[in-house]
């Protein structure tokens, strides 16, 4: 029995992430990555959060883009982000988990070692995810229990997609 306004089985969530929406989610990560790179190549401003980790204007800008666009695609699924207000995850069965700029310290060093991360979590397990590397336009994502990598073209579409062979966990 559900105690929240919506309840989805893992099957229904996976069905929500159809091919077209995967492409749109990759495009969202690409748009956020472009904004990160724009700031990377201009002026970076930094603040220190309560947990003593840095947050930049690129973190905030990418966060706004990703959260806004995911809410348009999936208004019924909450979005939780590292850069948003803290939310009690125990109350959330299914949610989007976003790290708009993973590797802020590396971003500040301007070494190119940072990513945009988007994951869908259900029952405390990731069931879909995207890792996008803006510096070289490489994306890694999961779909139908398989992992893929590809190059994101300037218009946000995928090319050179290949399956990544992974070992099964014991």
Language-model features, listed with the residues they occupy:
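Conserved structural elements of the adenylate-forming
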Residues: 111-115
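Acidic beta-strand-loop-alpha-helix segment within the catalytic core
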Residues: 119-170
